[in-house]
């Protein structure tokens, strides 16, 4: 329906519609190539209900991986850091380091930590990158299961603690 005419379109047979109806809550599809735009997207479908609570239908919108990448680029802590979004299957769907559409197995740090991140849902851990200690903080988005993480240099993450230590040491 790339001409804008959707009169012949029946969404009830589409997977996103069926999944939103079955889940009775917002659902996120896996990443796929949109037939019209040819861009990589994730669809978000949300059921809606009649006043009596019975299912009335579902609406769907696509999020391009480009848009998600722009949002990840804004994940910063005091202006520093790199962001990433990983889906529950281990597919990196957005990254400030150009890793979108790669699997966590291709990144040694993520490969070693991913199952723990899935299980714990949120937390942080330390790693070294390019000779600098980094803190990786992450949290799972409940509605999608996506893990959103940001890596920040340790010197930035703990700067206030370091200055507090100097203050107390000087007493």
Task: Walk through the language-model features, giving the residues of each.
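Tryptophan-centric aromatic hotspots in well-structured domains and transmembrane helices
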Residues: 16-19, 28, 82, 144, ...
């Amino acid at each position: 329906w790339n001409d804008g005419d959707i009169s012949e379109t029946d969404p009830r047979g589409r997977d996103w519609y069926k999944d939103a109806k079955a889940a009775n809550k917002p659902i996120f599809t896996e990443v796929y190539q949109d037939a019209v735009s040819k861009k990589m997207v994730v669809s978000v479908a949300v059921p809606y209900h009649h006043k009596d609570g019975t299912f009335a239908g579902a609406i769907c919108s696509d999020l391009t991986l480009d848009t998600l990448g722009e949002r990840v680029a804004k994940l910063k802590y005091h202006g520093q850091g790199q962001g990433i979004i990983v889906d529950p299957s281990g597919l990196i769907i957005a990254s400030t380091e150009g890793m979108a559409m790669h699997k966590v197995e291709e990144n040694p740090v993520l490969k070693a930590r991913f199952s723990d991140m899935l299980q714990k849902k949120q937390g942080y851990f330390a790693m070294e990158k390019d000779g600098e200690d980094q803190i990786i903080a992450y949290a799972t988005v409940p509605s999608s299961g996506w893990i959103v993480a940001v890596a920040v240099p340790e010197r930035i993450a703990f700067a206030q603690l370091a200055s507090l230590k100097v203050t107390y040491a000087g007493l």
